[in-house]
Amino acid sequence: MRVGVAHHFGWAVVVTASADHEVVDRRRIELIEPGLPAAPIHHVGGPHEMHRPDEPVDDPALAALVKEVRTSVARATSAAFDELVAAVPEPIVSLSVRSWPDDFPVDIAVLRVAPYESRADSVMYCEVLAEAGRARGWEIHRYDAKRVEAEAARILGTRADDVLFGPRAVLGPPWSKDHRTALAATIVAA
């Protein structure tokens, strides 16, 4: 079984597929526990007043908040993956997550300014998802969200429409772009 993830701030669509690209499981998972900001750098530490709930926080306070959020994301992701493993009929061998730059900054003062503050929280989710998969012994694949569906279609050839769009007819809604992206990521990883 291969798992593909299309994540957002605080939640993700997860699709599990068999070796011949049949959808075995699809679900929405929560990636953060309640009561914490889903995008701490963008919404709490960023430069935009409209996103901040209160006065700006300094770097040490933001770093502490990011650490707390990251720990929460790790717990929630681990619990969601435990539920997924229990639900699928065969072992999971790989996890595909959206790609992120290997050289993405880690310094909180750098992360809170453009161009990094708008991407920092997303990178955190990608990193935590990958860490949780690695901890389970899954092979980790990264995909380009803008290209993965086209890459999967090229791999599938004449089967592309049936495989990528067919699950909506077979499984019913929801079957959104996120579902197709996650499924396509499992195909490209195969």
Locate the predicted segments by residue.
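Phosphate- and other anionic-substrate recognition elements at nucleic-acid/protein interfaces
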Residues: 1-190
